[in-house]
Amino acid sequence: MKTIVKVCCTFCCMGLFFNCFAAKVDTLDVQSTVMQKTLKAPVILPDSYQNGERQYPVVYLLHGGQGSYRDWLSKLSDKQLLNKLANQYQIIIVTPEGGSTSYYFDSPLDKASQFETFISKELVQKVDETYRTIKDRKGRIIAGLSMGGHGAMYISARHPDIYCAAGSMSGVMDLNTKLWKVPADFAKSRDKNFARLLGAPKDTVSPYREYCAVGLVDKMKANDVKLIFDCGFDDIMIAPNRELHQLLLANGTPHEYIERPGRHEWPYWENAVTYQFLFFQKVFKANGSL
């Protein structure tokens, strides 16, 4: 009998333990008027949020291609990493749905793929209405991996009034698949996807330049948005990242660019995101948001 009671108590304690962790993550249902559908956005709150009235800065963390809003919480080997980062830096983290292959721009052809508007307007408005956030650009940063890295750089360049900084890990900085180190069939599938969303490319040498991070370097120079991006030596996106780095050097845009060992995979991004949050903390502190 004692053994049964002990086991029951153990499971009860375990349940309380896991509930404590689960309580730190909300999942918002965000209505997108522009796309006429509801999209999910997990929100990771620091423990201190429950006590007090202070306002918190927010990092919007975008997932990659063929991913979903679940990725940042389910694919890291340390399932509590985002909770730890939220607590360590006293930051709210939001990991929204971004579509499977949207690349986070507003498609002129597909009304169901308007993710620039969703991320930069509808999502931000919902988060600001729901939580005690710093409702100003000085309290918002956008970042992401792969397709999400493209989204972070693209959206921040076009909406400097919303974000004070942007971060990218292995970002798709150029939509020209000839620069990607990928199999031919994968490149072909992405070319078809871009044609579906944007129409046939007008320039086959540098297609869809206005929808690429590398095509927005003049905006990046004019904007007061702090930039950090990194890529692994063996990453399939190393060439576009080096391209963006060289363009920003040429036009004199301040930025931090890092190359280190790694590939286009979660172990690299799990390591990279911890370094990026150090950068984000520095930016928020300089803004008076932390």
Question: Predicted regions span which residues?
Answer:
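Cleavable N-terminal signal peptides
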Residues: T10, C20-F21
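Non-catalytic cap/lid and distal C-terminal segments of serine-dependent acyl enzymes
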Residues: A22-L290
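Short, linear, compositionally biased motifs with a strong N-terminal bias
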Residues: T10-M14, F284
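Sec-dependent signal peptide recognition
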Residues: K2-T10
